[in-house]
Amino acid sequence: MTIDKICLSYYNNPRKVVIADMFFFRMPIGVYSSPKDVPGGSVNDATSLIQSTEQVIYDIYDDLVELYPNNVTKQVMGEVFGKKINRYTFSNFAIENKSPSSDLAYKPFKICIITSIHGYEQGAAWTTALFFKYLYSSDNPYMAMLRRHVVFDVIPVANPSGFSKNKRKNDNGVDLNRNYEPDFIYSDDPKSWGYGGPQPASELETQLIMRFIEENLDAKLVLDYHNIDKGYPLFYVYGQKDVQLAQSVFASLSDKWQYEYPEFPKDQLLGYVRSNGKKGMLCDYVASKGLWVLTMETPWCMPEIGKEQYDAPTIRCVLDLLVNTLIAVVENLR
């Protein structure tokens, strides 16, 4: 439809033409680079993630709630096995419509992030917490853009009982990332690696996350962030858009990393994609709600440059990936 036809249609019937949400962001140029003094979470760092409880993550968020009460809010969604599942919302300042009779209001660009649904993947929670810390303390133009224009809704530790015991499953022995519909897999072997529980949504953690998703059906993206035991970072992909996003992000970051770290091999992408099967996972549930979901996996220890699980060089690289992925999403959906 041409612009003239759109205008004619609007004036003939002003309620008939619907134009999709538009977002006007001023985007910086280049690639975001994490600070060189990013703190690691290895056994040799001040914070050893595999020996910590979920509180080490919550402390970072709680500090932000105290420092920025007009922007950061906290909600205790529930308590499981004596441990809280917290939710934090990072809001920007919305423009006010001074006309009381108007129904035109600002629509936020919202991104949801869920981390550590597998308890022994503490690095995802740590990296995401550092992102939000830098989001409010950095004058980097990319951070300023995200801070001003994006609303983030976050569950930092989706499996606190597994986190504090450095194990994959929760205290019921259930893999929370296999406890969803659709495509739930029934199993009579509770000791199996990916045992998803006796039935879909049998676990309170799952029920709370489902409620979280239901309350965020206006989100532009749900990021399901995990850690893998080895290899370069990867995205599990569900469609062509995911592949194109991964190509763009890894192409830019590979150049950056290869320049900064001569240990990396040259002339190749330092990341890859994998197609995801349907296994009753969180991503399956989110996609069933018509939302765009990305599953991102970053390594416990970055090949070539990492020496210990969750050490500083690893965390710096995966923070690069997290932030530049969010930037790419905003840039291509605005």
Task: List each model region and its residues.
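Short glycine- and acidic-rich boundary segments immediately preceding or forming the N-terminal edge
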Residues: I3-Y10, P14-N86
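Short secondary-structure junctions
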Residues: L67-M77, Y259-D267, G271
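Conserved beta-strand scaffold positions in the cores of enzyme catalytic domains, especially
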Residues: K74, R87, V154, V222, ...
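Short beta-strand-to-loop junctions in surface cap/lid or active-site-entrance loops
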Residues: R87-K107
